[in-house]
Amino acid sequence: MIKLWPAIDLINATSVRLTEGKYDSEVKMARSAEESVLFYNQYQCVDRIHIVDLIGAKNQVSIESDYINQLRSLTDKPMEVGGGIRDRNTIDTYFNNGIDYCIIGTKGIEDLAWLSHMTQAFPNRLYLSIDAYRRQVKINGWEEDAGLDIFDLLQQVESLPLGGIIYTDISKDGKLEGPNFEITQQLVQATQKPIIASGGIRHQQDLAQLESIGVHAAIVGKAAHNATFWEGLS
């Protein structure tokens, strides 16, 4: 089965979801971040927990690291963190505190030499987050246009020892309308790197379709708070 990585998005140590990455669409989730981690601990099919520091992503500096350390202590499952990671010191701090993988976005996209250096220092432990409105890459908490096409960016990082590529179609994110299967499949075909799909995933049928097109893992946000999503999963 496709790997399942449920997401916990944080603003001020509160678990929230946004729609299309718009900060004014913030909705507090019924389960707290702590409750979510404990809930996901029950499922063998969850092989990683995906944490995003939303204000960190917007403000270009890690904000939630102390709270994320508390969440880390609640689970033995691998944990990855993204949002506001712009320097080696932040990566070192997360890794030293038991975080297994870090997600690089804006800094890596704007400074490929730095990204190359970091991936050499931490091979297969860094993931590049490519967040796009359809094919146009967005940066700084999805609020600015990077002036790049996702496939051009993918080609530029193909030789780097990344753990994989996390692709989010912003136009789908938080809507529970299904992921962008077409572009996701094109990305799978365009790279040797694992592609992780994010944004819009609704149910197990979406997971099955993503698996059928070669997606390595699925990051599930809003749907993971629906009881029906978990029916039949162990």
Curated annotation (Swiss-Prot):
Enzyme class: isomerase
Enzyme Commission number: 5.3.1.16
Active site (record annotation): D9, D131
Keywords: Amino-acid biosynthesis, Cytoplasm, Histidine biosynthesis, Isomerase
InterPro entries: Aldolase_TIM, His_biosynth, HisA_bact_arch, Isoase_HisA-like, Isoase_HisA-like_bact, RibuloseP-bd_barrel
GO cellular component term, pick one: cytoplasm
Entries under SUPFAM superfamilies matching the protein: Ribulose-phoshate binding barrel (SSF51366)
Catalysed reactions, as listed in the record: 1-(5-phospho-beta-D-ribosyl)-5-[(5-phospho-beta-D-ribosylamino)methylideneamino]imidazole-4-carboxamide = 5-[(5-phospho-1-deoxy-D-ribulos-1-ylimino)methylamino]-1-(5-phospho-beta-D-ribosyl)imidazole-4-carboxamide
Family named by the database record: Belongs to the HisA/HisF family.
Name of the protein: 1-(5-phosphoribosyl)-5-[(5-phosphoribosylamino)methylideneamino] imidazole-4-carboxamide isomerase
Organism name: Staphylococcus saprophyticus subsp. saprophyticus (strain ATCC 15305 / DSM 20229 / NCIMB 8711 / NCTC 7292 / S-41)
Underlying gene: hisA
